[in-house]
Amino acid sequence: MRAILCNAFKGIEALGFTEVDEPRPAANEVLVDVHAASVSYMDYLMSCGGYQLRPALPYVPGTDAAGIVLACGDRVTRFRPGDRVSCGNWFGAFAERMVARESSVALLPVNVDFTVGSTILHTYLTAWYALIERARLQAGETVLVTGAAGAVGVSRPQRRNRRSR
């Protein structure tokens, strides 16, 4: 299958298209036919070697994707082939197919486009974690979002509005 491969921690200059073996899902993983993958700052940092996690080289970058489940590991119970999903992994999304742990996969409603679905997990969950888990935001509190043009920043007001209803 075709994928983008990172051969050295030198940023986007070290990325290139190539053929790689299709991943196989472990017992707790799903194999996803990737219809869209998002690019995040974390992906960039990882390709430069500037993120706290450094995958073994070479590796297929990309943390978030959306697509259709092709196969499920033996212990997967929440998904089946044909399901539309949003999924995340530390790497592997910049390929035609990727694997993700069942716990890092969410069903994607039919009215949500794959391109939108590929941005949901890390950005929205980062915003959720910051506002709800860390800041312990309560209904009626005011939130100032700096850097609202980025993916996480855009998701914060949306999460805040939904939470206050």
Go through each PLM region and give its residues:
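Conserved S-adenosyl-L-methionine
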Residues: 161-165
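Residues forming the Rossmann-fold NAD(P)(H) cofactor-binding site
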Residues: 154
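N-terminal glycine-rich beta->alpha transition that marks the start or flank
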Residues: 11-12, 20-66
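Residue-level recognition of beta-strand microenvironments
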Residues: 6, 23-25, 37, 72, ...
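N-terminal Rossmann NAD(P)H-binding glycine-rich loop of SDR-like oxidoreductase domains
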Residues: 149, 157
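A glycine-/small-residue-rich N-terminal strand-loop-strand element
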Residues: 47, 66-90
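NAD(P)H dinucleotide-binding glycine-rich loop of Rossmann-like/cofactor-binding domains
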Residues: 45, 84-147
